Amino acid sequence: GILSTFKGLAKGVAKDLAGNLLDKFKCKITGC
């Protein structure tokens, strides 16, 4: 239903945000 769709969207957004933060963090450590 709509709730599970919303949950899936939220998960995807959280994943993207976490990925972006990880990339920035890696860049600080390894210099990209």
Curated annotation (Swiss-Prot):
InterPro entries: Antimicrobial_frog_2 (IPR012521). One of its GO terms (cellular component) is extracellular region. Keywords: Amphibian defense peptide, Antibiotic, Antimicrobial, Cytolysis, Disulfide bond, Hemolysis, Secreted. The keyword DNA damage does not apply. It holds the Pfam family Antimicrobial_2. One of its GO terms (biological process) is killing of cells of another organism. Its main location: secreted. It comes from the Eukaryota. Disulfide bonds join 27-32. It is found in: Secreted. Expressed by the skin glands. Antibacterial activity against Gram-positive bacterium S.aureus and Gram-negative bacterium E.coli. Weak hemolytic activity. Belongs to the frog skin active peptide (FSAP) family. Ranatuerin subfamily. This is Ranatuerin-2BYa. The lineage of its organism: Eukaryota, Metazoa, Chordata, Craniata, Vertebrata.
